[in-house]
Amino acid sequence: MFDLYLKNLLDLSDSGTVVLAKLPEAYAIFDPIVDVLPVIPVFFLLLAFVWQASVSFR
């Protein structure tokens, strides 16, 4: 029973990725954007290192 609960909770999509929530059908066109959104904070972290390297890590 717990295994069935996990399968429904994690809901593996066709591509094998874990989907924790699905957008309503009206917003299906935004799926590619929503997939990229969690990566944006990582870009800011990398930008901080690039910025510090450009000012010679003062």
Swiss-Prot record:
Pfam family, one: PsbK
InterPro entries: PSII_PsbK, PSII_PsbK_sf
GO terms of biological process kind: photosynthesis
Positions annotated as propeptide: 1-21
Transmembrane segments: 29-49
Superkingdom of this protein's organism: Eukaryota
Compartment(s) of residence: Plastid, Chloroplast thylakoid membrane
Keyword vocabulary terms for this entry: Chloroplast, Membrane, Photosynthesis, Photosystem II, Plastid, Reaction center, Thylakoid, Transmembrane, Transmembrane helix
Signal peptide: none
GO CC aspect terms: chloroplast thylakoid membrane; photosystem II reaction center
Membrane topology field: Single-pass membrane protein
Primary location class: plastid
HAMAP family the UniProt entry points to: PSII_PsbK (MF_00441)
Annotated NCBIfam families: PRK02553.1
Function: One of the components of the core complex of photosystem II (PSII). PSII is a light-driven water:plastoquinone oxidoreductase that uses light energy to abstract electrons from H(2)O, generating O(2) and a proton gradient subsequently used for ATP formation. It consists of a core antenna complex that captures photons, and an electron transfer chain that converts photonic excitation into a charge separation.
Recorded family membership: Belongs to the PsbK family.
PANTHER family, per database record: PHOTOSYSTEM II REACTION CENTER PROTEIN K, PTHR35325
Assembly with partners or alone: PSII is composed of 1 copy each of membrane proteins PsbA, PsbB, PsbC, PsbD, PsbE, PsbF, PsbH, PsbI, PsbJ, PsbK, PsbL, PsbM, PsbT, PsbX, PsbY, PsbZ, Psb30/Ycf12, at least 3 peripheral proteins of the oxygen-evolving complex and a large number of cofactors. It forms dimeric complexes.
Protein's recorded name: Photosystem II reaction center protein K
Gene: psbK
